[in-house]
Amino acid sequence: MIQENEIMVIDDFIDIEYQNQIKNILIGEETFKDYEFPWYYVDDVTVAYGESDTQHRPALTHPYVYYEGTSLGSIDSEFHKLFVPLLQRAAFKLGMPYVNALQGRSFLQFPLNLKNYDVDNPHIDLVEGHKHIVVLYYVCDSDGDTIIYNERKESETYTIKQRVTPKQGRVVIFDGWLMHTAEQPINNIRCVVNYNLN
């Protein structure tokens, strides 16, 4: 189990063949069980939970497991099965015999011509109070660092605990109550797989 405030960064978390399979399905032309991977447009990737504060950063997303406010999310996509081995490896690394997926999704962000390159809004992924672990997997090398803060709730100011640069095969596993965010990519696409487990 991960400790309070703990962050683990592990390169080559899965073997290169599996890394390339995920990459080729999500941002390439490979199919999974004869299905092409569908992406869904969102007006602003920085808006969460009905917030009115928008940074106008369109992106693409794909939900795998939908969070229903209970101890187990509902599977929303056939593509969730693609990530079961990754989640099993995370459970093993955490010393847990099994984990429950509360929420799972991917995001694909593009370089944008923005006037303001402030970081995305700091947030936690689940707001209902479930203790959870974030498993964030980077599909490809990119800019657009993940920034994890020391703070565990909304604050006027934030202090950086750790920055992590996206790199294919890298995973970041951390205490889900740590506020975190992402920088907008400037030079490359930024593609992540983001699961919340307990």
Predicted stretch roles:
Residues M1-Y98:
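Non-heme Fe(II)/2-oxoglutarate
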